[in-house]
Every structure is written in C-alpha cells, then in structure tokens.
Amino acid sequence: MENLSKRFNALQDQLMNIYESAPDTLESQIEHWQTLRKEAVLLYFARQHGISRVGYQPVPVLAVSEAKAKQAIGMVLRLQSLQKSEYGSEPWSLVDASAETFRSPPENHFKKGPISVEVIYDKDKDNANAYTMWRFVYYQDDDDKWHKSASGVNQTGIYFMQGTFRHYYVLFADDASRYSTTGQWEVKVNKETVFAPVTSSTPPDSPGGQADSNASSQTPATTTDSTTRQSPRKQSQQTNTKGRRYGRRPSSRTRRTTQTRQRRRSRSKSKSKSRSRSRSRHRSRSRSRSESPRRRSRYRSRSGSRGRVALRAITTTTTTTTRRAGGGSPTSTSSTTSQRSRQLRGGGRGGSRQRARGRRSSSTSPTPSKRSRGESESVRQHGISPSDVGTAVYTVSSRHTGRLGRLLDEALDPPVILVRGEPNTLKCFRNRAKQRYTGLYKSFSTAWSWVAGDGTERLGRSRMLISFISFSQRKDFDETVKYPKGVDRSFGSFDSL
C-alpha cells in the first residue's frame, strides 16, 4: 500500500511539472501521455487487489482505468508516428495533443488553429449556431504517410483538402433542419459575412445534391464526413439507386434463366411422357395380334426400355443445347425430340449409336453455366489451366464431386469478403490477420473507396477485399476471425482476381 502511494505521488509530481512548464514539443506531449498511461495502470492494479483509495485519490472501477490506459496507449502510438514525419519539429501544445481535440470534428485527426464560424438561420441573429474551423488538419493516407492540409468554409459546410478532395466534417444542412424554418442560413467568419443566405433545399455545392454548372467547374471534388438529412422519400430513392448500382438486382438474370429452364424441362417431360404412352398402347395392340407373344414382348420390352432411356438422354441434351443457343423455343425442342424418337423406335444398337452421337454433340457445345461430366473428370485428372481460373459464374455444387473436385471447381469462382470501415481500422485489421490468421486466407487488398459516377468525390467508408482459395476456407476465416468494432462485411465472388 505504501509503495503504491509513493509511486502514485511520483506520477502526480511529473504531471504537475508538465502542466506548469507547458512545453510545446512533441517529445513532451509523448511523455505526458506515457505518464497518464502509468497512472491508469497503477489504479487498475490497485482496484484488482481490492484497494479503494490511494492516498487521497479514490480508485475508479476497472473499466474506467482500462479505458484511460487504452486511450493513452493509442495517443502515444499516434504521436510517435507523427514525430517521425516532417511535422514532428513543429510546436505542439497540450491542447493540440489532447484527446478532446483529437476526437473533435474531424474525428481522429490532429489539428491546430481553431477559428470560430457562426451560422445564422432565417436571418435571425438570435437563432445562430457556432462551429469550429481548424486552420490546419493532419491526416494519414493509405501508406501511413502524414499530410498537412488547410481547412476552409463555404455555404455547404466546413472542410479540409485531402489531396484533390474536399472532406467535409461539418455540414450546415444537418442543423438547418432543426433550427431553421425556412431552410436558409448565413455564414460568418470572425463576425464577417462570408456567404449570403442560402437555402437548404438546393445547396449549390452540397455533396449529396446537384451542383451548378458554374460552381462545379470552379469547385473541386467533395466528400463528406456526416450524412445530410433529407426527406424519407429522397432517402428511399437514394437507397434504391445504390442498391441497383452496387448491389445485385432482386430479379437477377440467373433466376430468370433458371425459371425458364424449369418450364422448358417440364414441357419436354410432359410431351415425352405422352409419346411414350402412345407407343406403349401401340405395342400392346401389336402383342395381342402377334403369333409368338413371348419372344416379341421380350424383344420389344428390351428395345422399348433402351429407347426410353436414350430418348430421355437425348431430350435433355437437346433441351440443354437449345437453351444454350439462346434462341430456341419449346416448339423447336419438341420437334427435335420427335425426330430423334422416330430414329430410336428400333432400339438396340441404333439407340446406342444415337446416344453416343448425342453425347458428342452436347460436349462440343459451349457451356457457360454448367460443365459436362467428361469435362469435370478431365479437370480432376489434369487440374485447371491458369487461363480458366476465375471463369465460373455459378454456385459450386457439393454433390458427386468429392473434396478434390469441389476445390478445383471453387478455383474457377474465387470467393471474397468485402469489409468496410475506417482506413486505419482496416489496415490494423489486415496487419493483425497477417500475424495471427496465416493460412486462413489467400491475400488482402489495400484500402480503397468508391467514387461517384458524375464526380470524383469518395462515397461512404473505405473498403478492403479479402480473397480465398475456396468457400470452405472463407467459412473458416469468418468463423475464426474477430472483426473490429465498426467494421461491416459482405460476401461475394469474382470471375477472376
């Protein structure tokens, strides 16, 4: 107990010295956060051992000490990374390196030089709201390189330049729906009017709306840090548009093709059954009239069974070939079936020859959606050529293939997982997966973002792709890996990678 009190008092003295001297170097800020981390660890240790008070300081619960220690560790790592950059020699005060400043908009960024921005709604000076614009914002790119960017304000909101993009971290339209009745506001910086009153219905440079032709030619691309508030009708329209643009359509082409195939198969089966019934009646009559019923019935039963088996095989082959050609109709399928059924009435050797011909014709036809049995056997024996990897566009079946055959089939349609989140979170997740989950995946991509079709602004959060060798490997990865907080995932596959 006495040792804990002495160590705690020593840490308190170090913190008081830092606060009194108020250094403006990055080394001093790192030392400040290191001292806060030690203090949180000491209080955590005291609480674990049932100590409720260290000197005059009450010991908080374990969750509070743990959160403070983790916060201090995160700030130390970020400040050490910033210290290695070209901006490490700049003056950094306690306020610049504080957690409150780091978490203020734009969140998770270091910033300097606060400037007050006042927005007056409905031309009423009493109906105003104050915002903070930072003169400089420091951010990391996908390669963990630090950049220093200037911040600005316009009639849409407050932003900072991230390369060639305008990254908005304050949007005036968000608060206009709460404080304004007419949807108009006026922007003032240092008590000087910068932009005349504009309406929230058609903001000229809004990230979510259309921009003027003049404004779009003069204003660079924009991206936003928060979602603009719109009417439910507009939100539903945007949601449907995004679903059609980046998602799969509800009535996809594969579903329509599958339904069409089932209808054609049912028609061909019904027609083949009606023909087989008519043939069986004809044969029964001929048997009654014949002189040697036993021999003829045996011969006809054998030839009839062979003919029916061959007829079904050729009917399926003809239907598949017509369906692959894309221009056939049920009428053409039935006519082809009737012609071949006439040739098969003799049964026996003629039927086997026709079956062999049907197999040759079906194997030579193009098969984008389903491979023949001979092709599957050749794939299992000889493997897959590099040019065929990623060419399959159908879901792999687990029947009649075996483990090796399934793996080879899955190689034609490589599965992936798309994760969405903050860039730094995704990069940390990738580095942690490389250390802990080696063998559960094939490869990771870098962090990337979607770009609007009518502009260059980034849409939504950053994304990262994870590729796998097989669907079973993806399943093992998804069940084993713990995804970071705030990271979403979705499954998919590509023709090739």
UniProtKB/Swiss-Prot annotation:
Belongs to the papillomaviridae E2 protein family. Residues 1-201 are annotated as: Transactivation domain. Plays a role in the initiation of viral DNA replication. A dimer of E2 interacts with a dimer of E1 in order to improve specificity of E1 DNA binding activity. Once the complex recognizes and binds DNA at specific sites, the E2 dimer is removed from DNA. E2 also regulates viral transcription through binding to the E2RE response element (5'-ACCNNNNNNGGT-3') present in multiple copies in the regulatory regions of the viral genome. Activates or represses transcription depending on E2RE's position with regards to proximal promoter elements including the TATA-box. It is found in: Host nucleus. Residues 242-287, 295-305 have a biased composition (Basic residues). Keywords: Activator, DNA replication, DNA-binding, Early protein, Host nucleus, Phosphoprotein, Repressor, Transcription, Transcription regulation. Phosphorylated. Residues 197-393 are annotated as: Disordered. This is Regulatory protein E2. Pfam families: PPV_E2_C, PPV_E2_N. HAMAP family: PPV_E2. One of its GO terms (biological process) is regulation of DNA replication. Residues 413-497 are annotated as: DNA-binding domain. One of its GO terms (cellular component) is host cell nucleus.
